[in-house]
């Protein structure tokens, strides 16, 4: 009898875990992901989707070191591709969207274009850390494309991820930020500042990829949630935040 109880408890533990999907999401999904989760839970009220937001590069390092995530949404598809090569992935890497860069400010007239960054009024420019944040790499590429990187390098303030970079700009810790369109379109950002799109020819595509992470136990909830996010039903939500869906 005691053995039967133990077996039942173990089974219940497995069932409970199967109802929870742990998601590592790129920081540019800060406003999009909660809407995706809400729509999914409307169809699957018993599901639990546990989302962590952060830098795609740092998530890559964590997953490589055994972090317990079920799904990984990366703002740079190269990171999930590396995980697949290293044997951490179930199935294929899927491109779920392309992101865009904008110049954003609450105090500077960004309609003047990228060269406004050279103005004396601009003391600090926020970008995400290029070492591990995809939007930071693209921001650096953009500055170099327009040949102003050297002249503004001393003004750069680095955020750990693109959300922190946006916050630097909104809170006045930076005069201008090069951030994701997906963040600039959020109501709380739109109400406080203005932005202009940066020419996509000035930086490499922000191709974003997602994968299911291998685990000792198959998680059907994670598979269902990922399938839902990639469905046509979710395309309007992605487009609401400026993502280009392939």
Question: PLM features: what roles do these ranges have?
Answer:
Residues 4-14:
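Sec-dependent N-terminal signal peptides
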Residues 19-43, 48, 57, 61-65, ...:
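Exported/periplasmic ABC-transporter solute-binding proteins
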Residues 94:
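Active-site acidic carboxylates
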């Amino acid at each position: 009898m005691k053995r039967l109880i133990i077996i039942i408890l173990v089974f219940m533990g497995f069932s409970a875990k199967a109802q929870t999907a742990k998601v590592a999401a790129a920081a540019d999904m800060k406003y999009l992901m909660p809407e995706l989760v809400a729509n999914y839970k409307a169809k699957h009220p018993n599901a639990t989707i546990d989302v962590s937001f952060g830098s795609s590069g740092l998530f890559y390092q964590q997953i490589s070191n055994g972090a317990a995530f079920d799904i990984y949404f990366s703002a740079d598809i190269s990171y999930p591709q590396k995980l697949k090569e290293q044997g951490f992935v179930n199935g294929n890497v899927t491109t779920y969207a392309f992101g865009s860069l904008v110049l954003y400010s609450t105090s500077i007239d960004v309609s003047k274009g990228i060269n406004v960054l050279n103005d004396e009024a601009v003391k600090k420019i926020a970008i995400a850390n290029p070492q591990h944040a995809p939007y930071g790499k693209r921001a650096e590429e953009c500055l170099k494309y327009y040949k102003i990187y050297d002249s503004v390098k001393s003004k750069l303030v680095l955020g750990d991820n693109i959300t922190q970079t946006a916050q630097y700009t909104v809170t006045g810790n930076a005069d201008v930020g090069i951030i994701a369109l997906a963040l600039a379109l959020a109501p709380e950002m739109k109400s406080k500042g203005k932005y202009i799109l940066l020419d996509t020819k000035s930086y490499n595509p922000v191709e974003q990829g997602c994968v299911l992470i291998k685990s000792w136990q198959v998680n059907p909830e994670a598979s269902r949630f990922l399938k839902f996010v990639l469905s046509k039903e979710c395309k309007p939500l992605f487009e609401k935040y400026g993502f280009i869906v392939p």
